[in-house]
Every structure is written in C-alpha cells, then in structure tokens.
Regions:
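N-terminal organellar transit peptides
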Residues: 1-104, 108-114, 119-134, 138-236
C-alpha cells in the first residue's frame, strides 16, 4: 500500500514540476499553456519576477503539435510583454500549428503580448482585461544614428505585419494606436480594454474560460471532419 502511495506522490510531484517549468497542463485532449509575467528570452530576468521562458515553451509547442493524444491548445495570457524576438518567435510557432488553438486574455496582454494574443486561430478577451500597444523599446545604450532608428522601424514593422495578418485590425489603425500621445504619461502608445480590443478587430470576441473551451471543442470536432485545422479552416 505504501508503494502505491509513493508512486502516486511521485506522479503528482512530476506533474507539479512540469507545470512549474512549462506553464502548461494537459487535461484529456486539450493542453493549456499559460503565458504569464514577462517573456524571458536571450537574457535571464531577476529571480523575483514571474516569467515565461522561451526555452520551455518552444519544445513544448513542438511536442504538442506532434502528439496524437492532444487535439487542441488553450493559451491563457496575463503578460507584461518582454523579449521582442522571443515573444514574436513563440507567436509565430503557435500561428503555424496544425492543431486548433484558442487564446484567452486575462488581466493583460501588453506589448509583445499583443502578437501572442492574436496568434491563435480564435482569440477571446475578458471585459476587464487591458492591452498596451506601443512602439518597440530597447534597454541599455544605443547609438544615436539614423541606422538605429531604421532598425527599430524594421523590427516594429515585423510586429505590425504579424498582428494585422492574424487579426482584423488595419495597419493604419494599429500604427495610430502605437503613436498615440495623450493616453500614457511621458510615453507614446494606447491602453485599450476588452470591449475596445474587439471593436477594433484586434481580438475576435469577448468571453471567458467557458467560451474559450466551447469554441476549442467546436474547432476540434471540425478539424476531425476536415483532417486538420491549419490556416483558416477552423476560423469563423
């Protein structure tokens, strides 16, 4: 009897370690990934900050897309943003997955969290959530030359293109929101709530966990009928 208890305890410990490392948990045929805190990429963030680690999420997404057991992915976001390259890379991976994906923004989907919010085949946001849209930023010393600003513009255009390709917002409107000057003190950008995000076409629908799960189940059924859920086959 004690051996059985020890085995159960070992399984529970393994599951807890997996959740802690990957920010994800598998329930039946759906895998839930949480993207929280800051996106950690090329540099290690201070230990007191909550982070989503790029090196954990990338192999996890690969394993999910190759798994025969997992039929759909729910991405839950409450992120401040973080490393631009890593955040965009994660978003690109999710957008290219063949399996049904649904994102749900809770609390916030700020900065590079915006591409992560729209990368799923269907996106939801709760009414109380907010999203901060602003130009690309960099910490540390920069060289004050035209080439530096040209580099920033190229990086920003990559983000704008990805967001517009994976949502219904126009390029002109997104740029205008990024360059707004009367919403954030001593900075440029916009803060929008859940209703505004849907009205602008950035997010598909207002909804919570039940709405996101119901939509994901619908997409899973549809993908079984069509063979996969790549591209727009599962989108409404």
């Amino acid at each position: 009897m004690s051996n059985e208890n020890e085995k159960q305890q070992d399984v529970l410990t393994d599951e807890l370690e997996y959740i802690e490392k990957s920010g994800g948990i598998k329930s039946d045929n759906i895998h839930c990934i949480s993207i929280i805190g800051q996106i950690e990429g090329h540099y290690i963030l201070p230990s007191e900050q909550k982070t989503t680690k790029y090196e954990h999420i990338v192999p996890l997404l690969f394993a999910i897309d190759r798994s025969d057991e997992i039929e759909g992915v729910l991405i839950i976001l409450n992120t401040l943003g973080g490393d631009v390259e890593s955040g965009l890379a994660i978003a690109e991976l999710i957008a290219s997955m063949k399996k049904p994906t649904v994102s749900l923004v809770l609390g916030g989907g700020h900065s590079i969290g915006v591409p992560l919010a729209v990368c799923a085949k269907k996106s939801f946001i709760v009414q109380s959530a907010t999203m901060t849209i602003h130009p690309v930023r960099v910490s540390g010393t920069i060289i004050g030359t035209p080439q530096t600003y040209f580099y920033f513009e190229k990086m920003q255009n990559r983000i704008i293109k990805f967001v517009c390709d994976n949502s219904k917002i126009s390029k002109e409107k997104l740029k205008a929101l990024m360059l707004e000057t009367d919403q954030i003190a001593t900075d440029t950008g916009s803060v929008i709530d859940g209703n505004e995000a849907v009205e602008l076409g950035l997010i598909d629908e207002i909804g919570g966990l039940d709405d996101a799960l119901n939509e994901l189940e619908r997409m899973i059924k549809e993908s079984k009928n069509h063979g996969d859920c790549h591209g727009d086959s599962c989108k409404i």
